[in-house]
């Protein structure tokens, strides 16, 4: 009896070993078809086409094409590919290769290696795409330019139907050399989490960091940037009807050829209360205007009417955006010069409109404030800065306070008050 159970169990394992990969292969094929439909329906610049699909028990092969479109010009770039699929018990691994290879005919950018693009999918719908680029060297003889680097890795994690994606990248080094300038990047990393909120609007959190960037012009002094980072965060508010967005750019050090090291530098940008529906309308209207301009270039007799309608739609959607209320600006600006720090902030707010007041002019409701403080020595010692600040000082828009030049301005009721000097503004909308 025990022997019979062992034989039966072994038989079940054999059947499962055959059936499960086959079932996985079937589901993988369905997932690719569904993924293509989702990608093609979510935007207009990329189209995934899946053609012949030969499915086997433990592996499959299929061919397809990627179409990259420029929405403004209508130009297309077609990239045909072949894919080899290995089936497992809980998922599949797909290896993609361009039909025409990774490099133009006669070129050897990657030496004996080649990039590898794979996608690992699971039965429950999750997927991980990974692009691995080996060490490379690309030379453009026409422009006398060379690009070479250590290679890198890019990963994209997502799920079918989830409208969420995580992106990461790691690029140790990249050099762009030409007769005019050499550019060297070191340790570039990216971490980005994204979720679709509505239409073309995505929210999430991300960080882009670069350990160093060296710029070496042929006819000027070299500049080195160390510790450059960009942080962004967008989140939905008011039951997903609006969003807040924040961006921070930081630089630890700026090293000049003379040996001076300046830093740290910081610039922050904030956007609050952006209406999602109105912003989607703005995006659609701008796209329509670009398409109409392209149609006009190709002699479409209806293009002028399309352009006029698109311009009208842009104006209406912008008015709806402002009527919903918003706040935008740079709450913190901190830059370091050889003569001391430059500090400031710029904030603009619109309270929004209610009821019949939506049809009123928008500009009168705008309010804002601006502050700027720069070293007096910077204006005195730097000719370019002096030429820019001299007219402002003469008109009282910049005032001297100790060893600083100050500008304080407020905007309210169509009056811009700069250092106590009122400047009436015309209504623009």
Where are these regions (language model features)?
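Glycine-rich, small/hydroxylated-residue low-complexity segments
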Residues: 6-8, 16-429
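Positively charged n-region of N-terminal signal peptides that target proteins for export
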Residues: 1-5
